[in-house]
Amino acid sequence: MRVKLSLMRIAVVQCFNILDDARLAGDAIVERLLWAEEEGIDLTLFPESFLLGHTYDPETIRSRASVAASAIPALCERVAAIRSTLVVGAFDLADGQVFNSAIIIEAGRVVGRYSKAHPNEPGVTAGSDFPTFLRSGVRYGVNICNDANHPGPAQRIADQDARLILYPLNNMLRSETADRWREKSLANLIDRARQTGCWVASADVTGTSGNLVSYGCTAIVTPEGSVVARVPELQEGVTVYDVPPC
């Protein structure tokens, strides 16, 4: 008798920027998660630092990290009844140091976090741990944005028999810089997929914010490097894919 393998249904969300308003960001997250509940989504990925917004200003980074100390528990309360695993980015504080982290939330509880190994934001401490997690028979880990420029963090995840690497991104940049990274961001994800033999899924912000722009690089890439799903540039949206356990 042939045994049917279970699949991990993931959703990657491309969003407009929301700055310094955890309640409004929470509204956007809850709206997507309620949809995910109806669609049988196992895991929903949001962009880097989405909860309070990304920045390269050190004072703003530390301020947002301080606010996150209460914003993350508040978000957990709001999503406690939702089945889908939530992965959302925020600057956060630990032992007086600021990290750029992806927070993994299940049933209203923080079950883990990954802190960016190659932070390019001033005053942010590099993470040194590479945890993996199991959902629906698929082991996965997280890298964050600039980590995709480096093979090491992805390999640390793959070496733990992970099948999937999540990449929260935030490509909200000055227009000339955004233009340079428009193709490079996706190329990096393809490189990491081929290098590790893992599925790769990314979630990015999009649109404009002041004098900044992000085209959006929200995509799902096979271990062979084929892009099988992508949200159109400069549009909010979500794409869904079923990742096999092996």
List each model region and its residues.
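Short beta->alpha transition motifs characteristic of CBS
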Residues: 52, 103, 115-118, 219, ...
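CN hydrolase (nitrilase-like) catalytic-core segments centered on the catalytic cysteine
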Residues: 70-85, 149-233
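Short polar catalytic/cofactor-binding loops
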Residues: 14-20
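Active-site catalytic loop in hydrolytic enzyme cores
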Residues: 93-172, 178-187, 240, 244-245
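Cys-nucleophile CN-hydrolase/nitrilase-fold catalytic domain and related Cys-dependent amidase chemistry
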Residues: 22-107, 172-198
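Extreme N-terminal starter segment of soluble prokaryotic enzymes
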Residues: 5-12
